[in-house]
């Protein structure tokens, strides 16, 4: 129980750094999958512009698959950490087992979509036959072989919930390295491997994900000894599943809203294919920065959930304070890098006709990173304190209620020739700032009614 003692006794600022750094690296490497694919695809000799557009269009579905898996993992993470904090290993075993049962169900749905749904989805966003063909090929492979990313996401959260985030990072590094090695081999054709283009990018991605999942499965079996493991614990338990999704469903919806937002933004930008591609490329850079906040959030949530389960008001408040402080520092670094080096990122993707749109998007949307990062931290805090509804409210504001109407209205002025495409990019910083204001109010409320009621701090 050394890991639980660490969660209980180590100073929160040191604990958050110790747990947060591996998680931040893990999330950053997860974003690398998409960036590496786009970088190699953008440098194809033939059809690179169409291929980049295709990857932009398939991205929302990739995000949605990850959303469901990670959201399920987030619920598992918080519930498992809280259960361990309450010293209930029997329930913890059921939580872990039921999460894996849910993974099987999630994969079955992704498989069916990969077989029957990808053509209609891609065709809804473009009429270019080359883009449609490339998009179908790439997305079908990712869906049919999605079990890698699904079970990686679940085992990652099981390891994080017990304080073993280093092992999840090792698995992620292995997957990223496999992906990076295989991308040029399978895309361009090196040695005995034939040139496969965008299909090669898809295969490289899923093989990397499968490698990560297998390694994390081994780590889970070997190191997670706080609770029993076995197929018997995968038997569905309605109470456990409801407990997982009472926390995880808002996280799933939050991630799913990102997919919906990107899909609708693709439709809004459909009048300009170069701007559409530029948005897709920038979104992958933006994810790389925001995934740093997501990684820290994944340290914030189990730490606060654990001490909330133990009833330690001081450590809860420390978790909130340090979580927000570290997030702001990370986002400030992200803003600095993206504002100083937009041309370098454009060169990485060989952006072509999309270059100027991409640079404008980076300079404008990057302003929003500070507020976006704080919003992500707020959501991690809410989830740890059983504040799923508050987390959902922030997600709805950020990805639906404010951003899409605002971008839609701005696009009218752009299509009429009154303003340039850059006007649409301003919808993002405006949205994040307004959402951050609401998030602050919700944080004050949840601290008053969830943390304020705690009186016994003997366990802290």
Describe the residue ranges of each PLM region.
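Short alpha-helical transmembrane segments in multi-pass integral membrane proteins
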Residues: 1-20, 80-147, 193-249, 304-368, ...
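N-terminal transmembrane alpha-helices
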Residues: 7-39, 43-47, 60-75, 79, ...
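Transmembrane helical elements of multi-pass membrane transporters/channels
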Residues: 18-37, 141, 175, 208-212, ...
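Transmembrane alpha-helix boundary and packing residues in multipass membrane permease domains
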Residues: 23, 27, 39, 78, ...
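Helix-terminus/linker motif at the lipid-water interface of multi-pass membrane proteins
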Residues: 28, 32-53, 122-129, 185-196, ...
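Small-residue hotspots at the loop-to-helix junctions and early N-terminal turns
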Residues: 49-60, 135, 139, 202, ...
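Small-residue-rich hydrophobic transmembrane alpha-helices
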Residues: 52-112, 149-168, 278-336, 340-342, ...
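Short runs within selected transmembrane alpha-helices of multi-pass transporters and secretion channels
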Residues: 73, 142-160, 168-176, 201-216, ...
């Amino acid at each position: 129980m050394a890991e639980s003692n660490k969660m209980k006794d180590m100073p929160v600022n040191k604990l958050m750094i110790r747990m947060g750094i591996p998680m931040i690296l893990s999330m950053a490497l997860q974003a690398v999958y998409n960036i590496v694919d786009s970088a190699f695809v953008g440098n194809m000799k033939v059809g690179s512009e169409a291929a980049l557009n295709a990857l932009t269009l398939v991205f929302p579905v990739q995000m949605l698959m990850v959303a469901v898996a990670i959201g399920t993992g987030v619920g598992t993470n918080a519930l498992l950490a809280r259960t361990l904090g309450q010293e209930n290993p029997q329930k913890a075993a059921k939580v872990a087992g039921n999460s894996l049962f849910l993974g099987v169900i999630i994969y079955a749905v992704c498989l069916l979509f990969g077989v029957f749904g990808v053509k209609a989805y891609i065709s809804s966003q473009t009429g270019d036959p080359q883009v449609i063909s490339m998009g179908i090929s790439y997305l079908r492979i990712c869906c049919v072989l999605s079990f890698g990313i699904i079970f990686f996401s679940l085992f990652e959260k099981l390891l994080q919930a017990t304080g073993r985030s280093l092992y999840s990072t090792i698995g992620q590094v292995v997957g990223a390295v496999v992906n990076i090695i295989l991308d040029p081999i399978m895309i361009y054709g090196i040695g005995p491997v034939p040139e496969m283009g965008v299909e090669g990018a898809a295969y490289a991605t899923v093989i990397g994900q499968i490698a990560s999942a297998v390694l994390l499965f081994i780590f889970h079996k070997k190191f997670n000894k706080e609770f029993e493991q076995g197929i018997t614990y995968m038997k569905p338990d309605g109470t456990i599943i409801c407990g997982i999704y009472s926390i995880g469903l808002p996280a799933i919806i939050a991630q799913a809203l990102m997919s919906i937002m990107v899909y609708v933004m693709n439709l809004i930008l459909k009048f300009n294919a170069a701007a559409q591609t530029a948005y897709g490329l920038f979104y992958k850079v933006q994810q790389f920065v925001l995934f740093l906040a997501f990684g820290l959030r994944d340290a914030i949530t189990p730490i606060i959930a654990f001490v909330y389960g133990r009833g330690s008001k001081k450590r809860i408040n420390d978790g909130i304070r340090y979580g927000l402080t570290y997030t702001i520092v990370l986002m400030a670094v992200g803003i600095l890098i993206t504002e100083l080096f937009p041309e370098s990122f454009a060169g990485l993707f060989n952006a072509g006709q999309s270059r100027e749109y991409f640079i404008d998007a980076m300079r404008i949307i990057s302003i929003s990173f500070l507020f976006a990062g704080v919003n992500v931290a707020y959501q991690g805090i809410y989830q740890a304190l059983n504040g799923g509804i508050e987390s959902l409210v922030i997600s709805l504001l950020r990805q639906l209620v404010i951003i899409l109407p605002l971008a839609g209205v701005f696009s009218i002025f752009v299509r009429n020739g009154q303003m340039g495409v850059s006007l649409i990019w301003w919808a993002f910083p405006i949205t994040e700032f307004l959402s951050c204001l609401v998030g602050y109010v919700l944080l004050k409320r949840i601290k008053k009614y969830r943390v304020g009621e705690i009186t016994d701090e003997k366990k802290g």
